Amino acid sequence: MLCIKKMSFSNSNAQHTGGGGGAAASVASSDSYSGSGSGASGSGSGSDNVLVIKTVQIAPVRTLMCALKEILIETNITFQKDGIRIINMDKSHTMLAHMFLEAVNFELYECALDKIIIGVNMFHLFKLINSIDNDDTLTIYIEKKDYNDGVVSYLGLKFENGDIKQCKTQKLRLIEPDPEDLVEPQVAFSSVINLPSCDFQKIIRDLSCISEKLEIKSVGNELIFRCSGQFATAEVRRVESDGSMEFLHKKDSGKIIQGEFSLKNLGYFIKCTNLCNQIEMYLDNDMPLVVKYYVASLGTIKLCLSPLPSS
């Protein structure tokens, strides 16, 4: 089980937060709204909206939604002045996803309130996002009429394609937000490793054919992936080298760091592969494994997996 309240990830030299995890709080009522002129929804001027976000980075957003729907069935999404946050666990409480997309990285980001929290079925959101074309511009918005004293009933999505002069508008019916207050775990990790995301994907895919469990071990300047199944065993060794694998931080080069993790759950992690070229892996004994992906230039998502019990 993951214990995630009142903590945040870091290596032992510097805090590793990627923007932090906003805790749930009472949202300001619509009385505190001051217009955010953007005209996003096709339903009037910008003053009709409490939230307007615009991006042309369609492929990363689609990839992100595809990965999150496998881990989180339902989740809160928090919109604040500085960006968008998701922090939640899967139903088994063995995986945690923490996403932060910074406001400054969007083509347009206007949040009229200090905090807006919505509850979303991730599969339903993915079904809507998945229909967007890579050439479209995506606008996410919340109309003032759909915001009532901190409760949001609909999330608007607008797809615009200037080449064919087409505008498609959809509104996702929202669910009640989870009242539980989650923040990002704060943990000091002994080892932080940089690895190509496609290499990590291939290792996980290949070893998933052999076993359900994967041992990850850091020894000296080596990173070792090892598994054992009914019909075979396998081992992949990576040595630190320029452009391939690099230890960004290792507290004690002589210390052996290892843990055993579910390959099925790691299979959900590698759905983020196309988001970036390199991942950061955070390792320590008797600690969750954390894999950090960059969501193109929008922000980061950190995926956390608790170790399997010792056999």
Regions found by a protein language model. Give the residues of each.
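DNA polymerase sliding clamps and clamp-related checkpoint/processivity subunits
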Residues: 2-69, 73-209, 215-311
